[in-house]
Structure formats: C-alpha cells, structure tokens
A protein has these predicted regions:
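Well-ordered, non-membrane alpha-helical segments in soluble/globular domains
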Residues: 22-32, 57-65, 100-114, 145
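Short, well-ordered coil/turn segments that N-cap beta-strands
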Residues: 4-8, 40-42, 71-74, 120-124
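Phenylalanine-focused residue identity feature
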Residues: 13, 26-28, 70, 92-94, ...
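Aromatic- and acid-rich polysaccharide-binding/catalytic face
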Residues: 10-14, 25-57, 62-63, 73-86
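Active-site mouth of glycoside hydrolases
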Residues: 3-7, 11-22
Length: 153
C-alpha cells in the first residue's frame, strides 16, 4: 500500500438487482474499501456486461454515483462486452434481440458515449472480447463501432 508513479486502476463489477441497497455495488465499496486504499486509486472503473446486468438509460446516473463515491479518482468503464459465447445465456438484450452486430454497436455507442461524455473521462472502455468479436465470431466486427464512438465520427 504504497504510492507509485504508475496509474492505479480499481475495477468494480456492475451488478444489477441486489437483494437490497446494503448489498449494492456502492454500499459494498463504501463499506469495504477504506480511505487508506481509496487515496491510492487514480481511476475507478466499472466492468459492464449489459447482457447479464443491463445499465440502459441509467448509465449516466450509475457513473455519476460512482464519481460521487470516489470523488478523488477519475471514473471510467474499464471493461465492456456483449454477446460473448459465455454470455449468450444472458436474459437481457440491448439494441437488438436477434442481430448481434446491431446489439454490439448499440452497447458500444451507448455505454462508451456515456463514459466518454463525462468531463473527467479516462479513456474508452476495454472491449473484453475484442479479438473474438473482431475476427469473425457470430456478431462480426466491433472495431468500427468503437472507433466511431471514440472519435465522434
């Protein structure tokens, strides 16, 4: 627990619908991450898999709540994915229930846009299944959607 010159990133898994507010991501972080650790964290990110835990229109609110909880750190979506083979059983769809390309594009545009639209944004999300999604698994390439969102083109 010593400060270094390296950027220190903490990633928390976004999970929807905990039994009650005391078990939410934010309650957990407040309870389990002491100030001595918080002061060492440069960036707090969320791991987001909307197929399992949808964020939808709450993306800005969730990121704002994370920002308030970690006010001395920058906020990011540090992990993002949709439609990976181990996620296909997820109960939620985003953008399209039947077209994985449209669904991934919608996820990339919405969540990346919400993350990068913040004044204190720290980079674009890391698309977890990038290689698989880019080289032709069901759902096609994700790079064009990510590039368009990150450059605004």
């Amino acid at each position: 627990r010593e400060r270094t010159s390296a950027t220190t990133v903490l990633t928390l898994y976004y999970q929807l619908g905990q039994t009650d507010p005391t078990h939410s991501l934010f309650s957990y972080a407040a309870r389990e991450i002491p100030a001595s650790v918080r002061e060492l964290i440069d960036v707090v990110g969320l791991s987001v898999y909307p197929q399992l835990h949808p964020m939808g229109t709450a993306a800005d609110r969730v990121l704002s709540t994370l920002d308030a909880a970690f006010s001395s750190s920058r906020i990011a979506v540090t992990e993002l994915g949709y439609g990976g083979q181990d996620l296909n059983a997820g109960p939620w769809w985003f953008g399209s229930a039947s077209d994985p390309v449209a669904a991934r594009t919608a996820v990339a545009e919405h969540v990346t846009g919400a993350a990068l639209g913040r004044s204190d944004a720290w980079g674009a999300p890391f698309w977890w299944y990038y290689l698989e999604d880019q080289v032709g698994t069901p759902g096609g390439q994700v790079a064009p959607a990510l590039a368009a969102v990150s450059t605004g083109c």
